[in-house]
């Protein structure tokens, strides 16, 4: 079985399956690497409203709202996420870079 921790030092360092490349008061640029363990992409809720723009996406990355079918992520896709709305990512090939706008 693949041990993703050996390949994904960001998870070991931050405890999160991503790296924040840029953080401002208005937005975060976040990268999910190609070697993350898919089990780390869990259902969760955020404490604020957000819009998420896909900057770069490898093949097959998906976003899913609770009780909805997953949506394929492609560059320039924008997703709105309400405060405390359940959602998750599904791992694809390559990396995923998102711009998360705080509302």
Question: Can you describe what each PLM-predicted range is?
Answer:
Residues 67-84:
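Short acidic-glycine-tyrosine-enriched beta hairpin
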Residues 7-30:
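Transition segment at domain starts
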């Amino acid at each position: 079985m693949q041990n993703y921790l050996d390949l994904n030092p960001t998870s070991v360092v931050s405890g999160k399956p991503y790296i924040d490349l840029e953080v401002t008061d208005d937005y975060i640029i976040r990268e999910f690497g190609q070697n993350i363990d898919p089990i780390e992409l869990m259902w969760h809720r955020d404490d604020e409203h957000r819009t998420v723009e896909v900057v770069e996406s490898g093949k097959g990355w998906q976003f899913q709202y609770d009780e909805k079918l997953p949506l394929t992520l492609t560059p320039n896709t924008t997703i709105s996420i309400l405060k405390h709305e359940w959602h998750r990512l599904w791992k694809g090939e390559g990396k995923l870079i998102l711009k998360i706008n705080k509302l």
